[in-house]
Design a protein with these regions (language model features):
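Hydrophobic alpha-helical transmembrane segments and immediately flanking/interface helices
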Residues: 183-211, 272-295
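Alpha-helical transmembrane segments of multi-pass membrane proteins
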Residues: 25-30, 173-176, 212, 216, ...
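Transmembrane alpha-helical segments that form the membrane-embedded catalytic/substrate-channel core
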Residues: 110-119, 213-229
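C-terminal transmembrane module of eukaryotic multi-pass membrane proteins
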Residues: 217-295
Length: 295
């Protein structure tokens, strides 16, 4: 509910704390679960014991760089890019291949423009929310527009922006390319999920793993860096046939996704976690997958 401050003529949302609280709980939940899941190194694959083409692979473990065949719920060795688990990586928790690949998609998400705004507000309350006075003792960059004048709230500490160690956030524009590669990898996993022991079919997890790269694609291709890559550094879209017909069309698609960046950020985050949960439960035998193979 918006309430008007009669002294400053500002509109202030009395429930401003709900959004950062939900973000805090959501991100902490995902970090806790994904860390636990990556630590396991087992039960991330299901094919009902069949070793032919096809099966369900958790997105947390894709691609499977190494495989420890002694663990339950792991793919056949021919799915491994580099063979069995090497001794020189025995120090990794759980001897889990997830540690070798999660760094790439997580670096993209962690440095995402939306997520930066989200966790700055949720974890450091800097700023706590739009048009909300800063928390006492914290630096702030919040500004309010009052009667046409911009008045910065003064918390007594200087706000320096993303400087110093926070400059590493600039890796986002490079992590973006790895994120795009992972969309194709997970799309192959979705294709793989349509088969079991070489037989075509459909299961519940087939649909889950198919939706996963779609949501990740909507999130990734709505990225601000991709939008700049497509439409940035141009003064005129219609100055050439290429820019008019191709660049502008691509830019409009990316802009459509960009306007829904927050939505797809959360949908894709929740769905990738849900995908791992389902594969894990089926692989452990806790639930049965409903599928056309009858297994």
């Amino acid at each position: 509910m918006l309430k008007k401050n009669l002294l400053t003529n500002e509109l202030i949302d009395e429930k401003w704390w709900i959004s950062p609280l939900l973000v805090l709980l959501g991100l902490l939940s995902f970090v806790a679960y994904s860390t636990w899941a990556a630590w396991q190194g087992e039960y991330f694959w299901w094919s009902a014991g069949n070793e032919g083409f096809g099966g369900y692979l958790s997105p947390f473990y894709s691609p499977t760089v190494y495989i420890d065949p002694s663990k339950p719920g792991v793919p056949p060795m021919y799915h491994s890019l580099f063979g069995s688990w090497p001794d020189w990586l025995s120090w990794l928790p759980g001897q889990s291949p997830a540690w070798l690949i999660l760094i790439f998609p997580l670096s993209f998400r962690f440095t995402c423009y939306y997520y930066r705004k989200a966790y700055y507000r949720a974890f450091s309350l800097n700023p706590p929310a739009c048009a909300v006075h800063p928390i006492k003792g914290l630096p702030s960059k919040v500004s309010a527009i009052t009667n046409g004048n911009i008045n910065a709230f003064n918390s007594g500490k200087r706000y320096d922006g993303e400087t110093g160690l926070l400059l590493f956030q600039n890796i986002h524009r490079y992590a973006m390319y790895f994120a795009v590669i992972f969309i194709f990898i997970l799309s192959y996993d979705a294709f793989l999920a349509f088969f079991n022991d070489g037989r075509f079919g459909v299961g519940v997890e087939t649909l889950i793993l198919t939706i996963n790269p779609i949501l990740l694609g909507c999130y990734t291709f709505g990225c601000h860096s991709i939008r700049h890559l497509i439409g940035g550094n141009l003064d005129c879209f219609s100055c050439s046939v290429y820019h008019d017909k191709v660049s502008h069309s691509n830019w409009k698609i990316v802009t459509f996704l960009n306007r829904r960046h927050q939505l797809f950020a959360w949908l894709s985050l929740v769905w990738v976690g849900f995908s791992d949960v389902y594969v894990r439960l089926v692989s452990m035998g806790i639930i049965n997958d409903i599928n056309t193979w009858g297994i």
